[in-house]
Amino acid sequence: MTVFTPVYCCTDKVPVCYSRVDGADYITFSWNSSFWIFNWVSNMVYPRYDLIIGDVRATQNELETTFNEAQEGIESAAAKLLEKDPAKAKAFLTNYTNMTAQSAFDTWKRLGEFIIVKYNDGVVRKMKDGKFERNAIGQPAGVVRPGYPKEFLEEYVKQTGDRYKMPD
């Protein structure tokens, strides 16, 4: 689960969120690293893919559509700059690459925050008009308990046998 962002081959500055910011690597986590933010979101989605993937796809589509719609204008502006001053064209595309990378990072981080609130503890928090519902006294509204798919439950019983069977 990722977002395709424009990166130009002339770019001479790696977006901070794509770098080893805060020493981030495969065993050093950083909240400022795209690698770790995208993996954080993915790892929240995997166990309840059927419930959560719609939120991920909506965010992914929104970002990619925005980037795709801007592409023609960005490349036209870059081509005009290239004719006059190649260094300015390179700086323009470098800045655009960095901006889109940071935008995707920021959006994905907010998506992760949204997912953890909406799906925390195996429930689904109710929403209305894009906001989490509150009851008459301002507290979070009730939740939906979707349970698990029938196939999962059958496989669970198959693997555990009578281990969790309630005594008669």
What residues fall within each predicted segment?
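C-terminus-biased signal that marks the final domain/tail of proteins
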Residues: 1-168
